[in-house]
UniProtKB/Swiss-Prot annotation:
Organism of provenance: Escherichia coli (strain K12)
Gene: waaL
Name this polypeptide is given: O-antigen ligase
Phenotype seen when the gene is deleted: Deletion of the gene has no appreciable effect on the LPS profiles. Deletion prevents formation of M(LPS) when colanic acid synthesis is induced.
GO MF, one example: glycosyltransferase activity
Residues in the Periplasmic compartment per record: 39-43, 92-107, 154-167, 212-216, 260-348, 392-396
Record note on quaternary structure: Homodimer.
Length: 419
């Protein structure tokens, strides 16, 4: 009886502590996302602290009424990817492997996604409601800060593709686009949600993408912008029409300003495709197409099997020995196959493909159930990039993905009470 009374009297304090830790979790998610943009090593440390704070918050909170299957689907899909990556790593990693980098990247993804499943679950079951718009304006400023930083880097290395701190220009482009989506969507949740402010943000993002010269994002991001405008302004034809006209003007301006590098990248793409049709895949696009063909071939031969990075590389070499036109793919045998589905299938078989599709489905499902249009836009970005590259891999971009999901769910909770 006395014990029951003590527990009851302590409950308000534990709940308050849980709420404080939850707020700290979201703040750390914000910093994890930003730091991942420039420093892989430090970002994983901040992310690990975020996960610990999240777990403490969940423990102190106790069971909630909204702990249901609806709110478990997305965390489960994230956890499944992390678990499969961990199983794959444990089954095949050996000392002194020539594919150490590949194994290490999957181990990092496993940790990030397993921890991330708990952070996303905390967010989906959150009872916190805040009407402060200062947070939204802080998020909105991110794209402009990135654009300013990119301008500074470009002034020093004028003719180079900028890469920030994530290793490659392509990685910088993906990171910029994902953070840019969070930044742009944030302004749409404010009272001053005029499409001009969203498009101003889009202009900053497109400027950075043009500096990275990454074709996939330069094609994908305008489509995502149109999808966002349709989702948010479909009931206001005047705003929608004016915003589309302004978006076209922005795109035209970007093309004019960056005409030379864009034209060069376009010509390179045409040359790559021409080379591929002439049995030469040792080009950027040609290597991708060769990887897709090889990856599908490896999967079809053994669709139910997990296979090591060494085994996949051996299969790639055998296929290239038979079909020399696919030799461009060999350069990436110690990286990945530049498509989420094909990469997952080539190493983890049907289970790998299922886990990736389950994640995509879960993101769309939660976006629909929570009426989270921001999450829908982010999901389109994740799926779109996954068609031509692998981003559920390594450290920086997985951290940005999890953090972006969390932050978009947090700001969506301002307007929705659906659980």
């Amino acid at each position: 009886m006395l014990t029951s009374f003590k527990l009851h009297s302590l409950k308000p304090y534990t709940l308050k502590s849980s709420m404080i830790l939850e707020i700290i979790t979201y703040i750390l998610c914000f910093f994890s996302m930003i730091i991942a943009f420039v420093d892989n090593t430090f970002s994983i440390k901040i992310y690990n602290i975020t996960a610990i704070v999240c777990l403490l918050s969940l423990i102190l909170r106790g069971r909630q009424e909204n702990y249901n299957i609806k709110n478990l689907i997305l965390p489960l899909s994230i956890f499944l990817i992390g678990l499969l990556d961990l199983i794959w790593y444990s089954a095949f990693k050996v000392d002194n492997s020539p594919f150490r980098a590949t194994y290490h990247s999957y181990l990092n993804t496993a940790k990030i996604f397993i921890f991330g499943s708990f952070i996303v679950f905390l967010t989906l079951t959150s009872q916190l409601k805040s009407k402060k718009e200062s947070v939204l304006y802080t998020l909105y400023s991110l794209s402009f800060l990135i654009a300013g930083y990119a301008m500074y880097i470009n002034s020093i290395h004028e003719n180079d593709r900028i890469s920030f701190g994530v290793g490659t220009a392509t990685g910088a482009a993906y990171s910029t686009m994902l953070i840019g989506i969070v930044s742009g969507v944030a302004i749409l949740y404010t009272k001053k949600n005029h499409p001009f402010l969203f498009l101003l943000n889009s202009c900053a993002v497109l400027y950075v993408l043009a500096l990275t010269q990454t074709r996939a994002t330069l094609l994908l991001f305008p489509i995502i912008c149109v999808a966002a405008l349709i989702a948010y302004y479909n009931k206001s034809p005047k705003k929608f029409t004016s915003s589309i006209v302004l978006l076209i003007a922005i795109l035209a301006s970007i093309v004019i300003i960056f005409n030379k590098p864009i034209q060069n990248r376009y010509n390179e793409a045409l040359n790559d495709l021409n080379s591929y049709t002439n049995a030469n895949s040792v080009t950027s696009l040609g290597a991708r197409l060769a990887m897709y063909e090889i990856g599908l071939n490896i999967f079809i031969k053994s669709p139910f099997s997990f296979r090591s990075a060494e085994s996949r590389a051996e299969s790639m070499n055998l296929l290239v020995a038979e079909h020399n036109r696919l030799r461009g793919a060999l350069e990436f045998s110690n990286v990945h196959l530049h498509n989420e589905i094909i990469e997952a299938g080539s190493l983890k078989g049907l289970m790998g493909i299922f886990s990736t599709l389950f994640l995509y489905f879960s993101l769309f499902y939660i976006a629909y159930k929570k009426r989270a249009l921001g999450l829908l836009i982010l999901t389109l970005g994740i799926v779109g990039i996954g068609l031509s590259d692998v981003i559920i891999w390594a450290r920086s971009i997985p951290i940005i993905i999890i953090s972006a999901i969390v932050l978009l769910l947090v700001i969506n909770n301002r307007n929705n009470t659906i659980n």
